[in-house]
Amino acid sequence: MIYPILIFILAGLCEIGGGYLIWLWLRASQSPLFGLLGGILLISYGIVATFQVFPTFSRVYAAYGGVFIVMSILWGYVFDKQTPDKYDVLGAIVCIIGVLIMLLPDRS
């Protein structure tokens, strides 16, 4: 189960990092280079997600959505200094429970 978790984390870093760089370019008046690098990271995210071991696109992307939520909250805390409130934390916990419900059952 370590490999899928690492792929989810790498995908999240690519997607959130790419989106953040584009945000900085367009909303914080950073150099267009931020936008270009952000676009490259977003394309990389789409490629990294295909390395998942789960058989269906829908399950991979739905489960990744929960991971994305948690990582986005952590990204905001680390890079934007936005402390999550109790509702952010509770929502993230609910999402991870949903991810585990989707991915852990043996469907064979």
Swiss-Prot record:
The chain crosses the membrane at residues 5-25, 34-54, 60-80, 84-104. It is found in: Cell membrane. It is a multi-pass membrane protein. Keywords: Cell membrane, Membrane, Transmembrane, Transmembrane helix. It comes from the Bacteria. Its main location: membrane. InterPro entries: UPF0060. This is UPF0060 membrane protein Sca_1835. It comes from Staphylococcus carnosus (strain TM300).
